[in-house]
Amino acid sequence: MIRSASKTTVDPNEVKRFQLLANKWWNEQGDFAALHSMNDLRVPFIRDNLLNAHGGRRPGKPLAGLRILDVGCGGGLLTEPLGRLGADVLGIDPVADSIGTAEVHAWHDPDLRGNVRYRAITLEELSEKGGQGAGQFDAVVASEVVEHLADLETFTLCCNQVLKPGGSLFITTINKTQLSYALAIVAAEEVLRIVPSGTHDWDKFVSPMELERLLESNGFHVESIRGMLYNPLSGSWSWTESTSINYALHAVKLEEEPNLDEDDPEDPTVIVAQAKARRWYN
């Protein structure tokens, strides 16, 4: 069942948990080692899909001219490499100490100072009507984030709000299967200690089918879903046909279209009809 009750994306317990880890983000052999190595998959996944949509902008800086929002950026592990590809990246996180860690680390790289910024703010605060984030971004990235959220429905609506029409949403997360429980929680947290105990809650995991259904009912079209596999012996990630544990998803916000009912453009039945038409007949 999709979580939708709190109307906020932030779970206070998750904030407390990550507050304790805020100074550990850039230890490549520490609690976030698997996220560091995940960049080998997720950075090309984001880059290549954006290039397919927008084309190359500049040699060496292929994402130049694109605005990307990194939701739940933590210490900036993914924000920085996207910035090095030329994108104008805003990393946001509700944990202020994590933002502080990200800012300090980015400050040491002169190449990032002009196009990587951070804010200690929630997604819903950024996306509020009339806010600075509304309709401003070419892409939203939420990598290893949705399994920590309080409300997926609110998250989806907020992502739609901040994206430009035709903008991309990139998600990596964990499937809700018995295998994911055994490997992502029992093995990773309790046996191998790859991540701290208590990092994940299986009840918050979401299957690709559920996530796709939620996105496509809220103004997105899912373009692709790919399975990801972590090898704890080598500390590396690889693509796999199976999505039973980890997976990456790319969705696109539907382009704005003329209203079907010119007399009442605010009629919710018209909005629903438009969404269905786009989904089933495009």
Where are these regions (language model features)?
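N-terminal, positively charged/glycine-rich alpha-helical extensions of SAM-dependent methyltransferases
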Residues: 2-32
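Conserved alpha-helix/loop element of class I SAM-dependent methyltransferases that forms part
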Residues: 37-64
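Conserved SAM-binding loop
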Residues: 57-61, 66-181, 208-211, 249-251
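Short, flexible, mixed-charge acidic loops at enzyme active sites
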Residues: 180-190
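Acceptor-substrate binding/catalytic loop of class I
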Residues: 193-210
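Substrate-binding/catalytic lobe of Class I Rossmann-like enzymes that use SAM or dcSAM, i.e.
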Residues: 208, 212-221
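Conserved S-adenosyl-L-methionine
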Residues: 220-231
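Core SAM-dependent methyltransferase catalytic element
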Residues: 236-282
